[in-house]
Amino acid sequence: MQLSASLTQLIEALRCQPGIGPKSAQRIAFHLLERDRKGGTQLGNALTKAMTAVGHCESCRTFCEQSQCDICLSTKRQDSGILCVVESPSDVLAIEQTGQYLGLYFVLMGHLSPIDGIGPKEIGLDVLETKLAQSGISEVILATNPTVEGETTAHYIAQLCHKYKVGASRIAHGIPVGGELDLVDGTTLMHAFSGRRAVTQD
């Protein structure tokens, strides 16, 4: 069966999503055309609107539809003096959902990866350095992912913090709540042991 040009284009477009291969893209395309054309139209309209309307906060670089996001506009957060550095806007959402962090963010939109041609400027570290050079930030929380690239990025930023005499801390890594030791990888166990805390009595 020879697929039409429009259907082929739709399948190819769906493949741009991470984790979606040729078969999955074909399955989604056929489902939308067979059973959910209204949903497909809504998806197309939402994608078009989002691609046009959603940009980046000029201060923290997360997604927003204004020049600055609500977090950066918060006077209370501005006065906290704390800046949390993350790799992605999805990390901001995850941290915000805990309701425990009340500082500002800086979103890298990636991590250092020289082999892929991603250096400091590609992830906005020149912009971050400008922020550190200005007064107002007392602590930077390094919340990059616990990968080789994430650790390298955190180390680079920690050096920038030291240069401008700004405190830097790394989020703890260890055993997840409800996890079992025999199912945890060696690197995670190593972090858990090195980040252990004393047990005190109340």
UniProtKB/Swiss-Prot annotation:
Biological processes, Gene Ontology terms: DNA recombination; DNA repair
Protein name: Recombination protein RecR
Organism for this UniProt entry: Pseudoalteromonas translucida (strain TAC 125)
Biological role: May play a role in DNA repair. It seems to be involved in an RecBC-independent recombinational process of DNA repair. It may act with RecF and RecO.
Domain Toprim residue range list: 81-176
Taxonomy of the source species: Bacteria, Pseudomonadati, Pseudomonadota, Gammaproteobacteria, Alteromonadales
Listed CDD domains: TOPRIM_recR
Gene: recR
Family: Belongs to the RecR family.
InterPro entries for the chain: DNA_Rcmb_RecR (IPR000093), Rcmb_RecR (IPR023627), Rcmb_RecR_Znf (IPR015967), TOPRIM_dom (IPR006171), TOPRIM_RecR (IPR034137)
Single annotated GO MF: DNA binding
Keywords, sorted A to Z: DNA damage, DNA recombination, DNA repair, Metal-binding, Zinc, Zinc-finger
Zinc fingers (C4-type), renumbered ranges: 57-72
Keyword Metal-binding: yes
